[in-house]
């Protein structure tokens, strides 16, 4: 099945599909330049699937915050899709994503999804990252390069998260600086050279990935 067909099957909102395409574009570029080598295709596929169930946590009220979602065509339709997804998979985005992956027989990606979440909340340092999968590490980074408006610098995304949700604690904010520097050491490319313009050129290719 092609990625675009999977997105259609699970009725992924355009905004959510674009988010995953952006993360996958970042992930693909990072993986391509990973110094120790990695399975770039596996990394990219993981990024294309990592938020499949996220519609369950979107605030799709009639007075929706368009600064987060932009213009949504047929809002009533997407409210109905959200209710259907709630009924089938629940209201936890992480569990909904895993439920969809299991149903689609893509269970090989489930451990990476769970691992990425553990790394983030553990504020993983070198000892933990040395034992982690490259797939989860690159997803962790790529997801922190994308805002609703596009691919941005890592620091801009961290500040965006802090502004919107508040820093979880001071150690988290300090850790983000460390992790950004650690990631740069793992690749043979200037991470700041990965931009929205460069990532957008990959969208058509990414939608035709076979999973």
Residues covered by each model-derived region:
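Divalent metal-dependent catalytic cores for phosphoryl transfer on phosphate-bearing substrates
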Residues: 7-10, 36-161
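Alpha-helical phosphate/pyrophosphate-handling elements in metalloenzyme active cores
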Residues: 12-43, 107
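Generic N-terminal amphipathic, Lys/Arg-enriched alpha-helix
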Residues: 1-13
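Charged phosphate-binding loop/patch that engages nucleotide di/tri-phosphates or the phosphate backbone
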Residues: 168-211
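Generic structural signal for well-ordered, non-membrane alpha-helical segments
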Residues: 16-20, 90, 94, 169-172
């Amino acid at each position: 099945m092609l990625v675009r067909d999977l997105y259609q099957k699970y009725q992924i909102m355009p905004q959510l599909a674009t988010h995953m395409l952006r993360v996958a574009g970042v992930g693909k570029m990072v993986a391509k330049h990973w110094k120790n080598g990695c399975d770039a295709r596996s990394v990219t596929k993981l990024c294309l699937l990592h938020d499949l169930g996220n519609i369950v946590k979107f605030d799709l009220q009639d007075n929706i915050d368009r600064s987060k979602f932009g213009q949504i065509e047929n809002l009533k339709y997407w409210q109905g899709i959200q209710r259907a997804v709630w009924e089938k998979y629940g209201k936890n985005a992480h569990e909904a994503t895993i439920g969809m992956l299991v149903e689609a027989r893509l269970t090989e990606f489930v451990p990476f999804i769970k691992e990425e979440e553990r790394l983030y909340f553990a504020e993983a340092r070198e000892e933990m990252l040395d034992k982690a999968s490259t797939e989860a590490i690159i997803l962790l980074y790529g997801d922190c390069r994308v805002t609703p408006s596009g691919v941005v610098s890592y620091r801009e995304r961290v500040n965006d998260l802090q502004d919107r949700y508040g820093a979880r604690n001071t150690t988290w904010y300090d850790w983000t600086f460390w992790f950004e520097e650690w990631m740069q050491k793992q690749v043979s490319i200037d991470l700041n050279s990965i931009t929205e313009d460069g990532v957008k050129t990959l969208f058509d290719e990414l939608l035709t990935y076979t999973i």
